[in-house]
């Protein structure tokens, strides 16, 4: 089984090995990107997530979701 490598634009995310354990975070926040996926998995709507994590913009969240969708749709993963 092949795995998807998701390329995320620098205007959406940042990572610093010295901060937050090197976790990938939304740009200009300390909110880890994986928090979005965890919340969606738990049944939280995107609107609720954005209300709870005010520093994350809708454009950032949708951009991350679109990048993940694109990576998972790659025919080379079949």
Language-model features: locations:
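A short, structured beta-strand/loop element
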Residues: 7-48
């Amino acid at each position: 089984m092949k795995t998807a490598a998701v390329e995320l634009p620098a205007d959406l995310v940042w990572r610093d090995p010295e901060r937050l354990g090197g976790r990938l975070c939304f740009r200009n926040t300390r909110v880890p990107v994986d928090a979005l996926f965890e919340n969606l998995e738990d049944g939280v709507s995107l609107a609720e997530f954005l209300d709870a994590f005010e520093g994350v913009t809708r454009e950032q969240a949708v951009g991350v979701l679109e990048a993940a969708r694109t990576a998972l749709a790659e025919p080379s993963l079949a």
